[in-house]
Amino acid sequence: MESRDIILRPVVTEASMALIDNKRYTFDVDPRATKTQVKKAIEEIFEVTVIKINIMNVKGKLKRQGRYAGYTKKRRKAIVQLSADSKEIQLFGEE
């Protein structure tokens, strides 16, 4: 799997934005990716040093459209802790 295929998108929520102050970044990753693959991809794409990764599987939510019910897509979320001497990751382009 290519590095760009592993990291799908950053997660932009109030909670994940609060973690950025502690150099912790949250990303949606490929459901088949392991911690080792995620670490390698983050270090390769953003040129930073990763010291810790927490990964969680998020279940799909039940959604209804009239009498028809279905589930949203399940996803895998990774919270990445960078080392103190690593540069910050620019999620929204140049500021």
From Swiss-Prot:
> Keywords for this entry?
Ribonucleoprotein, Ribosomal protein, RNA-binding, rRNA-binding
Question: Single Gene Ontology BP term?
Answer: translation
Give a single Pfam family match.
Answer: Ribosomal_L23
Q: Which GO terms describe its cellular component?
A: ribonucleoprotein complex; ribosome
Disulfide cysteine pairs (residue numbers): none
Give the transmembrane ranges: none
Q: What terms describe the molecular function in GO for this protein? A: rRNA binding; structural constituent of ribosome
Query: What domain of life is recorded for the organism?
Result: Bacteria
- Spell out the subunit comment: Part of the 50S ribosomal subunit. Contacts protein L29, and trigger factor when it is bound to the ribosome.
UniProt xrefs under HAMAP family: Ribosomal_uL23_B (MF_01369_B)
Q: Briefly state the protein's biological role.
A: One of the early assembly proteins it binds 23S rRNA. One of the proteins that surrounds the polypeptide exit tunnel on the outside of the ribosome. Forms the main docking site for trigger factor binding to the ribosome.
Concerning its family, UniProt says: Belongs to the universal ribosomal protein uL23 family.
> What is the name of the protein in this document?
Large ribosomal subunit protein uL23
Q: Which organism is it from?
A: Pediococcus pentosaceus (strain ATCC 25745 / CCUG 21536 / LMG 10740 / 183-1w)
Tell me the lineage of the source organism.
Bacteria, Bacillati, Bacillota, Bacilli, Lactobacillales
